[in-house]
Amino acid sequence: MDVKWLDVPEGDTEELKRNVFFTTLEQLKAWARSNSLWPLTFGLACCAIEMMGVGGAHYDLDRFGSFFRASPRQSDVMIVSGTVTKKMAPIIRRLYDQMPEPKWVIAMGSCATAGGPYVKSYSVVKGVDQIVPVDVYIPGCPPNPAALIYGINKLKEKIRYEAKTGKKVL
């Protein structure tokens, strides 16, 4: 970014270029949001055990600025893990609607992304993306905690990219 340095002595312009940070307000908000994600955990099966491992001392999701919340009104990310049944679908939708904007969804595991091994059952939803819009898919049965951290980091990149370019990433 070219800036005209008015009334600044020649030696001080290099010092200013090294120490002054230029950005837009949208990029600053996206940076703050991406570094303070508060996920709502919605564990329905064995993937939830791996999600609990992320909160433990070995992986410690807190060091990335993400703190698990029990209420959808305090969350901005919903992590859905496990088999979603048709009976559970309206509850997931209601929780998603209770979350404040902006909000994002992570589908964790084969069951949440595509129905998993129970996909041919009459009562299983063929992926949580049929209920709520999903931003990040994490494959695996079950995916390990490192994969969930990777997915959260990809969501952070997506938030920053959308603010920088103004384009919605699908």
UniProtKB/Swiss-Prot annotation:
Subcellular location: Cell membrane
SUPFAM superfamilies noted in UniProt: HydA/Nqo6-like
Catalytic function, reaction form: a quinone + NADH + 5 H(+)(in) = a quinol + NAD(+) + 4 H(+)(out)
Gene Ontology biological-process annotations: aerobic respiration; electron transport coupled proton transport
Binding site for [4Fe-4S] cluster: C46, C47, C111, C141
Keywords, in A-Z order: 4Fe-4S, Cell membrane, Iron, Iron-sulfur, Membrane, Metal-binding, NAD, Quinone, Translocase, Transport
UniProt-listed Enzyme Commission number(s): 7.1.1.-
Annotated GO MF terms: 4 iron, 4 sulfur cluster binding; iron ion binding; NADH dehydrogenase (ubiquinone) activity; NADH:ubiquinone reductase (non-electrogenic) activity; quinone binding
Cofactors (names): [4Fe-4S] cluster
Residues passing through the membrane, by range: none
Signal peptide stretch: none
One GO term describing the cellular component: respiratory chain complex I
InterPro entries given in the database record: NADH_UbQ_OxRdtase-like_20kDa, NADH_UQ_OxRdtase_20Kd_su
Topology class, membrane: Peripheral membrane protein
Gene3D superfamilies reported for this sequence: 3.40.50.12280
Co-factor: note: Binds 1 [4Fe-4S] cluster.
Main localisation: membrane
Summary of subunit composition and partner proteins: NDH-1 is composed of 14 different subunits. Subunits NuoB, C, D, E, F, and G constitute the peripheral sector of the complex.
Protein task: NDH-1 shuttles electrons from NADH, via FMN and iron-sulfur (Fe-S) centers, to quinones in the respiratory chain. The immediate electron acceptor for the enzyme in this species is believed to be a menaquinone. Couples the redox reaction to proton translocation (for every two electrons transferred, four hydrogen ions are translocated across the cytoplasmic membrane), and thus conserves the redox energy in a proton gradient.
Entry's family note: Belongs to the complex I 20 kDa subunit family.
HAMAP family, A to Z: NDH1_NuoB
Protein name in the entry: NADH-quinone oxidoreductase subunit B
Name of the coding gene: nuoB
